[in-house]
């Protein structure tokens, strides 16, 4: 699996049942729906990325099939360019539509892919985790907030 880094100290995070923790003991709880929020504590309470209404609108639009050809092309390219046991990061995964399609395309090759979907929007990641697939893990994360 992809290594996750602590947003506080930069140390490697390890999963311990329902929490991700670094060697410096900074910890990040895994939500009931299965995702982890890795935004730094200084970002707590602030809204980042899409809100619930925006995520719902995007999900409704994508469910109408307008982008199915593009989603299929992206997933197919990933399957073609990687092995069936690939470890893939979907940075800016939104509500997980592309992430799940990539997972399905890789799994169809008979492998056991591992995908990490990351987005700065907690609402989008919540929805992605609720609709997730095996082998897909979602995190609220950002490379930098400055």
PLM features per residue range, with description:
Residues 1-48:
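N-terminal auxiliary segments of SAM/dcSAM-dependent transferases
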Residues 51-73:
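Class I SAM-dependent methyltransferase Rossmann-like catalytic core
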Residues 85-94:
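Conserved class I S-adenosyl-L-methionine
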Residues 95-110:
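Conserved SAM-binding loop of SAM-dependent methyltransferases across substrates and taxa
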Residues 114-119:
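Conserved SAM-binding motif I beta-strand of class I
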Residues 121-123:
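Conserved SAM/SAH-binding beta-strand->alpha-helix loop
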Residues 128-129:
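Conserved SAM-binding loop
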Residues 133-144:
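Conserved SAM-binding strand-loop segment of SAM-dependent methyltransferases
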């Amino acid at each position: 699996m992809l290594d996750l880094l602590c947003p506080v100290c930069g140390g490697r995070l390890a999963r311990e049942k329902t929490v991700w923790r670094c060697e410096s003991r900074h910890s990040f709880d895994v939500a009931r729906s299965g995702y982890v929020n890795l935004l730094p504590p200084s970002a707590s309470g602030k809204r980042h990325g899409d809100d619930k209404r925006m995520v719902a609108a995007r999900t409704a639009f994508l469910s109408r099939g307008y982008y199915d050809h593009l989603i299929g092309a992206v997933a197919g390219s990933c399957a073609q360019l990687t092995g069936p046991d690939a470890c893939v990061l979907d940075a800016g995964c939104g509500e997980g539509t592309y992430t799940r399609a990539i997972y399905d395309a890789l799994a169809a090759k008979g492998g056991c892919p591992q995908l990490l979907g990351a987005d700065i929007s907690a609402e989008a990641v919540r929805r992605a985790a609720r609709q997730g697939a095996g082998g897909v893990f979602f995190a609220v994360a950002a490379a930098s907030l400055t």
